[in-house]
Amino acid sequence: MDKNYEQRSQKVSFGLVGKNIPYSFSKKYFTEKFSKLNLSNHEFYNFDIDNINQFPAILNKHPQLKGLSVTIPYKEQIIEFLDEISEEAKDIGAVNCIKIINNKLIGFNTDIYGFENSFKPLLKSNHKKAIILGTGGASKAVKYVLNKLSIPFVLVSRNPILNDEITYQSLNDDLIKEYQIIINCTPTGTFPSINEYPKIPYENLNETNYLFDLIYNPSETLFLKKGKENGATVKNGLEMLEIQAEKAWKIWTSS
């Protein structure tokens, strides 16, 4: 927290904008953080909206908002409502953090920071190439980080459109051997649909593979469980969320 950040006597609000987010990590995390820091005048809301066009109404109803997190499916759609956007968020085309200062909305992407710092510690020398499952907003920060780390990748989509996208049916033994990192950027397997999982050839996985799931609830998705059963290194998205949340807090409270 910035040393110039002052605890005000009036209410200070933050929130999460998304769809179907009653289970959200953010509200619990920041409510506990406010309690630990004795910020009794701070509150965190879940803004569960069906359509991005409902976003301006949130701002009108809560003029005391100082910062917002943005989650699926609005990380791309939110951009048109912003006054400014960071260079990284502009390059990615997705925003998951908004700082509100003097009624100006400034967009950032802290997913980059969260993913890179959670993903890198388990990288091994043989992890040269990656498979990204999913092509939505969540995959954009992952692609950005992999490019930064000079890790080539292919994108897997149910409905491939671009040249660098392939189908799930294209994932064979040779690809799994060559692309030893597999990152799940789809919501498949998220609570409550915990019996679902991306359809990849898990039987071809072994101890050389590294499976990273952006999902954090449940803590072990079937994607990770099946990978672990075949000897792969696995990691869920909880630490990534914690790291990006702390980054968002620094952005919100910096002068």
Show which residues each predicted segment covers.
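Active-site capping/gating segments
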Residues: N117-S118, T233-S255
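Short helix-loop-beta connector
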Residues: I101, L123-K129, L205-E207
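Rossmann-like adenosine-cofactor binding region
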Residues: D164-K235, E239
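Residues in the short beta-alpha loop(s) of Rossmann-like NAD(P)-binding domains
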Residues: N20, N159-P160, N217
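Glycine-rich adenosine-cofactor-binding loop
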Residues: G18, G107-I112, F119, L123, ...
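Short glycine-rich anion-binding loops that position phosphate/pyrophosphate groups of nucleotides
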Residues: V70-Q77, A138, P187-T190, N217
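Phosphate/diphosphate ligand-binding glycine-rich loop within oxidoreductases
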Residues: D2-L122
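NAD(P)-binding Rossmann-fold cofactor-contacting core
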Residues: K148-E165
